[in-house]
Amino acid sequence: MSVDFSSERVCYVHCSFCTTILAVSVPYASLFTLVTVRCGHCTNLLSLNIGVSLHQTSAPPIHQDLQPHRQHTTSLVTRKDCASSSRSTNNLSENIDREAPRMPPIRPPEKRQRVPSAYNRFIKEEIQRIKACNPEISHREAFSTAAKNWAHFPHIHFGLKLDGNKKGKQLDQSVAGQKSNGYY
């Protein structure tokens, strides 16, 4: 996959939380709009206006010390500024260390583990039951049998019980001709 560099600009952004250098590729059409970037290392969200930053960082001559432009807790350096000398990156990291205290990154909420569905619980228990009765059956065959058992027993879907329940017995008898020993 090739990237057309004539339609976009690659810039380097320092994360204000973990000081990781991020390569940001921005289309020229979006240069003067506010861009949000997420750090892949610490998941910190960085908001910056790359067009304004590029204009301000490219104005001074290359031989002068690099003065990073700060926009919403980020610093931006263009490719030619980073490549000009190792001294400029050292000055940049020193300036970041001297700045105001850092705010903690905005982290997404943790995902809660969901309770397994009735279908998943039934299939798991049914596979275990089938394999206990016939240990030589493959997992694939046991799953297929368990899925058929789920499909052909409507009382399972609705949570009806067979113990003394007249309706449950009627439902069980309606599929009795299709099964042997209660299971496929």
From Swiss-Prot:
Residues 76-115, 162-184 are annotated as: Disordered. Pfam families: YABBY (PF04690), YABBY_N (PF24868). The keyword Transcription regulation does not apply. GO terms for molecular function: DNA-binding transcription factor activity; transcription cis-regulatory region binding; zinc ion binding. Residues 76-94, 171-184 have a biased composition (Polar residues). A zinc finger (C4-type) spans 15-42. Disulfide bonds: none annotated. The keyword Repeat does not apply. One of its GO terms (biological process) is abaxial cell fate specification. Expressed at low levels in abaxial regions of lateral aerial organ primordia leading to cotyledons, leaves, flower meristems, sepals, petals, stamen and carpels, but not in roots. Gene3D superfamilies: High mobility group box domain. It is found in: Nucleus. Keywords: Developmental protein, DNA-binding, Metal-binding, Nucleus, Zinc, Zinc-finger. One of its GO terms (cellular component) is nucleus. Involved in the abaxial cell fate determination during embryogenesis and organogenesis. Belongs to the YABBY family. Interacts with SPL/NZZ and SPEAR2. This is Putative axial regulator YABBY 2. It comes from Arabidopsis thaliana.
